[in-house]
A protein has these predicted regions:
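Bacterial N-terminal signal peptides that target proteins for export
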Residues: 1-11
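C-terminal motif of bacterial Sec signal peptides marking the signal peptidase cleavage site
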Residues: 15-18
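Bacterial signal peptide processing site
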Residues: 20-23
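Post-signal-peptide N-terminal segment of Sec-exported extracytoplasmic proteins
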Residues: 28-30, 37-77
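Solvent-exposed coil/turn segments that connect beta secondary-structure elements
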Residues: 35, 70, 82, 93-95
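Amphipathic N-proximal alpha-helical interface segments
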Residues: 72-89
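C-terminal partner/receptor-binding element of secreted or periplasmic proteins
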Residues: 89-108
Length: 108
């Protein structure tokens, strides 16, 4: 009985950790001539137009756009300033295609 409880606890913790942490590798990496601010101003309305509810934040000199999910881990776009504009990292974690990455590509 103890083994079953310990296994269930370990599995539950693993699932929760996957929701709370960012993966090491982005799903998509893009370069843009736009600044992070210009990119965010483009992508947020596109996500809203796809019935998503993006949350924009600006931690430590970059922009982060998060789309919360009740079923999977949150989808995240991070836009950083680069020498020729910006660098964009897309972390699309939903199981089915949602148009999240496509919106980022359209704003490059």
């Amino acid at each position: 009985m103890r083994t079953v409880f310990a296994s269930a606890t370990l599995i539950a913790c693993s699932l929760l950790a996957g929701c709370a942490s960012a993966p090491n590798e982005p799903t998509l990496t893009l370069e843009t001539s736009k600044s992070p601010e210009q990119f965010a101003a483009c992508v947020v309305p596109k996500l809203q137009g796809r019935s998503m509810s993006p949350i924009l934040s600006q931690p430590q000199r970059h922009y982060r756009i998060t789309v919360p999910s009740t079923v999977a881990a949150d989808n995240v776009i991070e836009a950083y300033k680069a020498s020729s504009g910006g660098k964009v990292f897309v972390y699309e974690r939903s199981l089915m295609a949602s148009g999240f990455g496509r919106a980022a590509k359209e704003c490059v």
